[in-house]
């Protein structure tokens, strides 16, 4: 049974991703900043007959927490097949660069970018032991430079410059790490769930968490080692 770690998996898209992968016979570790919330999420899955799940406490913005999570998993598994970097925060409004709060920007980057980087670094040795592993970074179209500069662009995305720039950085990390790991058997890709109703956007998204999880799951279960350094959405690729 392949093993998966999903950060931010006690609710929303992360929880739905965990549910769907567990139903496909993956063993899923649900990462949660709060251990109790993680246990509650596991119970919800147990209550519907899903038992191939456990929780692990991990705050991706806290390196000590990340290391403790890695040490915990090392006592349970010899390798990790899939790491899904899902944990993220939206940040406060306003998010314009001209006058926005730099401390807000730092907080968002600490989780969405630096948190992803340090989590990936800590779990990379376990991923390398898999033989064929995948790192999936959950991104957003608001981080796409191509969409931000296209003719007739959606100016509504300008409301999310703090969040969006953290995802732009995340996408750069995806490409550069994929290039670094090209001969290791580890593929690295970004994926956007789309505008999904979660607490990240006060449940205003058009998609359900179940729908938002689908492109993540699709990417997780594909086995083509040549698919790396790409940015996916439901139904295709996204321009960087």
Question: What are the residue ranges of the model-derived segments?
Answer:
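C-terminal helical subdomain
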Residues: 168, 183, 190-191, 198, ...
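The beta1-alpha1 cofactor-binding region of Rossmann-like NAD(H)/NADP(H)-dependent oxidoreductases
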Residues: 35, 56-69
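A glycine-rich helix->loop->beta "capping" turn
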Residues: 50-52, 72-85, 91-93, 101
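Catalytic loop of short-chain dehydrogenase/reductase
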Residues: 89, 93-109, 128, 132-182
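Conserved glycine-rich Rossmann-like NAD(P)H-binding loop of the short-chain dehydrogenase/reductase
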Residues: 24-40
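Canonical Rossmann dinucleotide-binding motif of NAD(H)/NADP(H)-dependent dehydrogenases/reductases
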Residues: 1-29
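Hydrophobic positions on the long internal alpha-helix
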Residues: 84, 119-123, 127, 173-174, ...
């Amino acid at each position: 049974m392949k093993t998966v770690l999903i950060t931010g998996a006690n609710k929303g898209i992360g929880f739905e991703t965990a549910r769907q992968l567990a139903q496909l016979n993956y063993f899923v570790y649900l990462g949660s900043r709060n251990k109790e919330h993680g246990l509650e999420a596991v119970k919800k899955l147990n209550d519907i007959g899903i038992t191939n799940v456990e929780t692990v406490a991990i705050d991706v913005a806290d390196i000590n927490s990340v290391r403790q999570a890695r040490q915990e998993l090392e006592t349970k598994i010899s390798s990790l097949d899939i790491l899904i970097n899902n944990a993220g925060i939206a940040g406060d409004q306003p998010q314009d660069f001209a006058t926005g709060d730099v401390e807000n920007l730092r907080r968002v980057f600490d989780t969405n970018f630096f948190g992803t980087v340090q989590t990936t670094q800590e779990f990379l040795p376990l991923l390398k032991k898999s033989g064929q592993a995948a790192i999936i970074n959950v991104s957003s179209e608001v981080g796409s430079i191509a969409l931000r500069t296209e003719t007739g662009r959606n100016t509504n995305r300008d409301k999310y410059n703090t969040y969006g720039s953290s995802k732009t950085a995340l996408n750069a990390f995806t490409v550069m790490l994929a290039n670094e790991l090209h001969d290791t058997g580890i593929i690295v890709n970004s994926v956007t769930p789309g505008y999904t109703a979660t607490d990240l956007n006060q449940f205003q998204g058009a998609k359900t968490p179940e729908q938002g999880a689908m492109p993540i799951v699709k990417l997780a279960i594909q086995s083509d080692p040549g698919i790396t350094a790409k940015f996916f959405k439901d139904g295709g690729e996204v321009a960087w």
